């Protein structure tokens, strides 16, 4: 789960990380009063969306008068902001964060992530802040600094000190950076975060460190322990189909293709999407119904797939272990009768009660295209659309 910048900064401040502050606007009628309350020389108007690249897309504006700040804020509120992370459809701006501007002497990048490949928490930092870290990693990888934390020992003083020295800090800035590293690590652990990113982390004209922008991504599996974090969720920033799927206990991610996929197991789902690409088409979604799905969940999964108007065909690929193939077959038939499936439907079943499942489908009277293996299924659905 992601949260907005202003929410991320509020959490960081609770842990002792110095951040820039401002006022949040959630409706146009509040804009003028918010700017009057701020009453500063330089205003920074920021669109609050769950996507990066706001600055380049016009979602961050710096102005030097109250009147101009009000105009910029009114113009920005409610627009559809398109960045390299939103895709061409963009994201509607329903919230603004308006801050006082500050003089920047130097910008840095700092983040803490869970590195799955190394099975540990890793700090990533760079002297090249204020830009996409992916761009820095691609063009000048030598400017990326990484420190991994052994989960058996946790964060040690040498980690924090090493980061401070590698970034070139001196004197009181070393102490400030060490405190930021320790505070961010504590926030990461205690909130069950998957990533905390501060970009940029700046040195202001007084020579002090300040988080100018912040991003949190939380591990969804840990959210049940944090109702206070769940309360920060903004469903307007989420795909409605993904939200609907999550409420039904389904793992669904919308994509840009035309072939809907319903699979049990994340690995099999990835393999199914790969083979669809291999046969020349593009998947419309990732959808894992899970091992314990019942007839109603299968029916809901197909309804969600068909809610995507770009779907021109559906491939169901089920390996029955805990999941029984006859239950899948009954769910498919129930969905077809309930909502009507007007696009080609290819079904590949294997495993527990597979023959019973195939019999149920063949006796249903529905136009279902059977497939005996994954390659056959991919070939048939691509040909059918």
Swiss-Prot record:
Ligand binding (Mg(2+)): 199, 213
Enzyme class, UniProt record, top EC level: ligase
GO molecular function, one term: succinate-CoA ligase (ADP-forming) activity
PROSITE patterns for this protein: ATP_GRASP (PS50975), SUCCINYL_COA_LIG_3 (PS01217)
Biological pathway: Carbohydrate metabolism; tricarboxylic acid cycle; succinate from succinyl-CoA (ligase route): step 1/1
Cofactor requirements of the protein: Mg(2+)
Residues that hold substrate according to the record: 264, 321-323
Catalyses which reaction(s): succinate + ATP + CoA = succinyl-CoA + ADP + phosphate; GTP + succinate + CoA = succinyl-CoA + GDP + phosphate
InterPro entries registered for this protein in UniProt: ATP-grasp, ATP-grasp_succ-CoA_synth-type, ATP_grasp_subdomain_1, Succ-CoA_synthase_bsu_CS, SUCC_ACL_C, Succ_CoA_ligase-like_bsu, Succinyl-CoA_synth-like
Cross-referenced Gene3D superfamilies: ATP-grasp fold, A domain, ATP-grasp fold, B domain, Succinyl-CoA synthetase domains
Annotated GO biological process: succinyl-CoA metabolic process; tricarboxylic acid cycle
EC number, UniProt record: 6.2.1.5
Keyword annotations from UniProtKB, A to Z: ATP-binding, Ligase, Magnesium, Metal-binding, Nucleotide-binding, Tricarboxylic acid cycle
Domain ATP-grasp: residue ranges: 9-244
Binding note for cofactor: Binds 1 Mg(2+) ion per subunit.
GO cellular component: cytosol; succinate-CoA ligase complex
Superkingdom: Bacteria
Binding site for ATP: 46, 53-55, 99, 102, 107
SUPFAM superfamilies assigned: Glutathione synthetase ATP-binding domain-like, Succinyl-CoA synthetase domains
Family affiliation: Belongs to the succinate/malate CoA ligase beta subunit family.
Function: Succinyl-CoA synthetase functions in the citric acid cycle (TCA), coupling the hydrolysis of succinyl-CoA to the synthesis of either ATP or GTP and thus represents the only step of substrate-level phosphorylation in the TCA. The beta subunit provides nucleotide specificity of the enzyme and binds the substrate succinate, while the binding sites for coenzyme A and phosphate are found in the alpha subunit.
UniProt cross-references to HAMAP family, sorted A to Z: Succ_CoA_beta
Subunit and interaction comment: Heterotetramer of two alpha and two beta subunits.
NCBIfam families membership: PRK00696.1, sucCoAbeta
Protein's name according to its UniProt entry: Succinate--CoA ligase [ADP-forming] subunit beta
Gene this protein is translated from: sucC
